[in-house]
């Protein structure tokens, strides 16, 4: 049985520790943990094309582009999400390897199940 099934809620540090050991990705919202579903080929292609276009546009700037394997902390909502694509230009995010917390832009690709 997983820790998520045994434990009703997590605090953020416990979630980050637990999530780092999981084979699948989970998002976190105010103590609750949610397993992430896979994406279609079209969804992944659209997200990748957007990430590549942003990366090319931002080349030479202090900004970095991340895809769906990097967590984004939304402190105001006590949450960690895996956006399809996001951009951060914050120097503080360069030092943080497990997640980023200062997104300048967030891109979510909508699908029939998420729109």
Q: Predicted regions span which residues?
A:
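Gly/Pro/Ser/Thr-rich low-complexity, intrinsically disordered segments predominantly at protein N-termini
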Residues: 1-115
């Amino acid at each position: 049985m997983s820790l998520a099934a045994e434990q009703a809620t997590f605090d953020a540090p416990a979630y980050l520790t637990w999530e780092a050991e999981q084979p699948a990705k989970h998002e976190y919202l105010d103590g609750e943990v949610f397993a992430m579903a896979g994406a279609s080929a079209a969804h992944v292609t659209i997200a990748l094309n957007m990430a590549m276009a942003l990366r090319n546009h931002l080349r030479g700037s202090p900004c970095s582009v991340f895809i769906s394997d990097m967590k984004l902390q939304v402190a105001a909502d006590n949450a960690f999400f895996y956006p399809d694509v996001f951009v951060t230009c914050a120097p503080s995010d360069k030092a943080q390897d497990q997640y980023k917390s200062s997104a300048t832009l967030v891109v979510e690709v909508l699908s029939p199940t998420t729109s």
